[in-house]
Amino acid sequence: MLRNLLLLLLPLLIEAKLPPFFLGRLNGKTLLNHHLDRLTASDGASIQETYPNLQVHNFTQKLDHFDPYNTKTWNQKYFYNPVFSRNNSIIFLMIGGEGPENGKWAANPNVQYLQWAKEFGADVFDLEHRFFGDSWPIPDMQTSSLRYLTTQQALADLAFFIEFMNQQYGFKNPRWVTFGGSYPGSLAAWFRQKYPQLTVGSVASSAPVNLKLDFYEYAMVVEDDLRITDPKCAQATKDAFVQMQKLALTAEGRNSLNNHFNLQPPFDANTTKLDINNFFGNIFNTYQGMTQYTYDGQSNSTHSDKTVRKMCDIMTNATETDVVMRVENLFLWFNQMEPASANLTVMPNSYWDVISQVGSGDLNVLGPDGAAARGWMWLCCNEIGFLQTTNQGNNVFGTGVPLNLFIDMCTDMFGDSMKMSQIMGGNKKSQNYYGGADFYNATNVVLPNGSLDPWHALGTYGTIKSQSLLPYLINGTAHCGDMYPSYDGEPGSLLAARAFVKENVRQFIRYDPNVDGPGGSSSSASLFVVAYIVCGFLFV
């Protein structure tokens, strides 16, 4: 049960005490927007000052696409970039995800798909996800209101948006291609399943389509990455976690952990198993954050510094004989780039602080970061799962992050209507609806994944060339690595991967430079037909 007193905490406390990395995402931002903020750091100029041709609009969206008697509407935010348009009805749509959209994915000409937009003469849109950023179907996040925050409603939002834009901008024989990375990549993949008539293709980067509730495979891939980088790194990590778990068993040992990590609040005589699990979750977050970003093109730090290699250098530093001290050094180093609090030496250590911050349905109490974290947690608890545990048996991280930690979070954040049976039922229903990885079936979709990315374990890898269902595993890259600008010294596999994606986008839109290029006439573009295969799925 939530502690009512803690729900009165100010938004300032929310931003100060949420862990920087929460269920595979940076707090307050989608993974993509976090990366692009680093890539395009400026002197504080607004997005429209930096990109004056970028337009920001709202349009009238339906509240409930599946209840014909519900006529309520709301304003959904989108960005429109006409700079590359040659009026040939080629349209690229970036799908917004689990945080605010800031417009950079519609405007920054250096990201890969905007380079293709320039070459192909595409109009570009970026649609913000319902219940994130400035797009509020209902002006609160009470559990009763969040019934409208589902993947099916989000996909229907996309469909209604495309139909509306076709009319508003007068697109003739439109050739829409959707793009998304991470959770929006899942939406891009599922949109090709459920609404194939509205687009000619999708690029679903790092898209988890297998809706695992207990996502222990995440930790397995992190461990594999450590072993690939340096077998001694994996062993040092295991030794450290074994030692920390031993320390957690006694009052003296817990006091040692207090001193190592400057835990606030510290472990004391009232420490519970839940507190211990929460601590190990915070330690595991550091490994998650390092691995998920490794070698991507977001900034100089991820090119060569904020990498698995650097993490392993710290964990195998022979001059430091105390393996727990190595983990402390890793936390302090990571915390400089992703601060957990204003004091870079402090590790926030209160399970109930997180619950109080994300458990409120009041937007004024939540603040921007708390609202985004609550929305993401709802999606995970209510249907998509992705709960990142260390439940995989014998492993380097031990058993400190069990599924029950997240089940408790779901119940404590959303109430008694969100208990184990409801969580499992909602997850199974969505898995059956979309088919999971084994039964994913669509036409004209490219699904790139990075081999080092823990999320690739939930991808689909069954190629069907006849219907252009095209998974692509990129060796030596991590989360959404294919989407960023190229850089000197990047993994060599990215060059071929980007060329593969681009060529298939070209085929999806049936690009003809004689018609679609400069001086081409959109009126002479031929109407084409794409064959679609639609699968039926079992509803539970």
From Swiss-Prot:
Q: Which GO terms describe its biological process?
A: innate immune response; proteolysis
> SUPFAM superfamilies from the xrefs?
alpha/beta-Hydrolases
A single GO cellular-component term from the record reads:
membrane raft
Q: What is its EC number?
A: 3.4.-.-
Molecular functions per Gene Ontology: dipeptidyl-peptidase activity; serine-type exopeptidase activity
The record's InterPro entries line, in alphabetical order, gives: AB_hydrolase_fold, Peptidase_S28, Ser_carbopepase_S28_SKS
One matching Pfam family: Peptidase_S28
Q: What are the record keywords, sorted?
A: Glycoprotein, Hydrolase, Protease, Serine protease, Signal
User: Glycosylated where?
Assistant: 58, 87, 270, 300, 317, 343, 441, 449, 475
Q: Which residues belong to the signal peptide in this entry?
A: 1-16
Show the active-site residues. Answer: 182 (charge relay system), 453 (charge relay system), 479 (charge relay system)
Protein family membership: Belongs to the peptidase S28 family.
UniProt protein name: Putative serine protease F56F10.1
This chain's source organism reads Caenorhabditis elegans
